[in-house]
Amino acid sequence: MTRVSLLHFRLILAMLVAGFTAAAAGAQTLAPDIVVTKVINAPVSDVWKAWTTAEGIESFWAPKAAKVEPVPGGAFELWFGVNNPEGLRGSEGCLVHSVKPMEQFVFEWNAPPEIPAIRKLRTLVYLDFKPLPDNRTELTLRNFGYGTGPDWAKNKAYFDQAWPAVMGSLEKRFAAKG
């Protein structure tokens, strides 16, 4: 099985497990997507680099501990708790799913360490880049694949707050340059 095929298998398996978990809990559907859109005062090429390179990620989000390989099957690992035990540092094990240069970047994401029951399951994050006049970029982040039940509700509530903060941090990073 190729690495890309394995990625798709892992995603489908994670979503099936989430669905079965939700069904076992009496839920009918997965939780709604999280969608955040920002207009960034930078050209698409700069915003793209901010998301697809370790240096870019470190410039607005993660401390000096990011591993980003912007190819399908490549790593998308950000460590927020550098001194935490292995598996509890950040997005260890998360992978890039799809890359359409300067248009779309898709990666896996996991629950924070405080929610261990679903930490090995993954959601997907889609970033869509749209060029605007005056060297600006409309960036839309869509995070989906949340199951239902208490742990998934905690995870979703966390990222309902976290993703807008991350996007705001990116916006400020480029506003500071303008």
Positions of predicted regions on the chain:
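Short beta-edge strand/loop motif at the mouth of beta-sheet-based domains
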Residues: E55-S91
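Bacterial N-terminal signal peptides
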Residues: R10-A22
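Bacterial N-terminal signal peptides that target proteins for export
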Residues: M1-L13
